[in-house]
Amino acid sequence: MNRCSGILMPVFSLPSPYGIGTLGKAAYDFADFLHAAGQRCWQMLPLGPTSYGDSPYQSFSTYAGNPYFIDLDMLIEDGLLEKSEVQDLNWGTEPRYVDYGKIYESRFAVLQKAKDRGWVRDREAVAAFQAENSRWLPDYALYMACKRHFGMRSWTEWEDADIRLRKSPEVLERYRTLLRDDVELFTYLQFLFYRQWNKLRDYLHGLDIQVIGDLPIYVAMDSADVWAEPESFQLDDQCVPTEVSGVPPDYFSAEGQLWGNPLYAWDRMQADGFGWWIRRVDGASKLYDVIRIDHFRGFEAYWAVPYGETTAKNGHWVKGPGMNLVGVLTGWFPQLRFIAEDLGYPTPGVRQLLQDSGLPGMKVLEFAFDSRDSSSYLPHSYGENCVCYTGTHDNSPLALWKDEAAPEDIAYAREYLGLNDEEGFNWGLIRGGMSSVARLFVAQMQDYLELGLHHRTNVPGTQSGNWQWRLLPGEATPALARRIRHMTEMYGR
């Protein structure tokens, strides 16, 4: 990747009249904004269908797209919906935040109407899509249909052990027949999602904009991935996890973080040549040009917590697959570019794995000015092969960080970067990242808008109020694009 910059902006954060960002007009408008601002990367969060809690990192599938992102106006233009069928529905009352409850109530009934009109009309195109995605689509569509049948509960709670444990091909076929309409619905929704996505991605490529996407290291227990291939995970003979994921206690959390995802059966995966991971990254390559590997340090060693624990305190470190896996992925996908999210617990082993892989790691400016210790996040310590962020989706926007950080940290930032009121605090921090030698610089959209309190994307460790922030219509102005472009060109990005 040549020297460039981009903006972190989740799809759900785009403005739209239907309560959540979609792949429609606002996505194309944002692409135009990026182009006008001289940005060559759009970083997104995972695009999969979300579960309770709405986290894109806990998805029902590592391959499927979120039906919430299917643009309804495009379906109206395509003759699949009538305007009257969507305009009077309650999509939420606050344009700044997503109301997932309201969207859940309204969205699928509308999409069912689109499927009823389009399933037969588009049968040849749908059949081709099914053939291209035969490795994951049948399992995903059946999984979602079964979830509906069993009250949207996770597969681990389904009463029928035959389908819960996938005891025979005959059982799967019986449920496909029983739930045929829902299987068709979830198949068709993926057809619509990918049709709209491919069109948007082609448009972005026409503007010389690359898509950076996240690959969460773990998948959700409540997912088609685990249900369909339980042998790839650390589960017992009743498909109950033996240990689950998390991170140990640290300076910020005395109990650590209990994520609860099933852990991989790395020995079995390696014996299979890491085929599961090859298929997964191949699926991600149909969405993204650059893949950020979340929690990269888990490839070196991961924190395993006994199943049933209520905190992560009693976990232990287990050696991960390391270069055995990373080498396979970079070898199989030479055209893909990867970013290693190497934040947290930078042990010598993690640093060595990053060096051996050749992948760029991450530098976060908000971590640079902690006056308690010298920091490798300070721009003067960067090498070219890294990605500099103002902050990630898990961090406060700069304007909020300024209010939350220790006064001595802010004083250090002011001195180090020569911050002044005329330029503005946010823009001075952005200048620090833009001017660094890091090959790629990424800022959150909130940082360019100088938004602080109530504008976080996510607060780790909390269960509500996350993944809701949205851009308002008219905030991404031509004047803002010109200012971003001026700084981008000044620093050769």
Give residue spans per PLM region.
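Conserved, well-ordered alpha-helix/loop/beta-strand core segments that scaffold catalytic motifs
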Residues: 186-219
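Surface-exposed amphipathic alpha-helices with a cationic face
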Residues: 35, 197-205, 330, 354-355
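C-terminal accessory segments of extracellular proteins
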Residues: 479-493
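Trp/Phe/Arg-rich N-terminal binding region typifying the photolyase-homology
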Residues: 1-80
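Short alpha-helical segments and helix-capping/turn motifs at coil-helix boundaries
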Residues: 25-32, 195-203, 277-279, 425-429
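Outer-envelope exported proteins of Gram-negative bacteria
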Residues: 45, 210-212, 216, 290, ...
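Alpha-amylase-like alpha-glycosidases and glucanotransferases acting on alpha-linked glucans and related
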Residues: 10, 54-194, 219-442, 446-453, ...
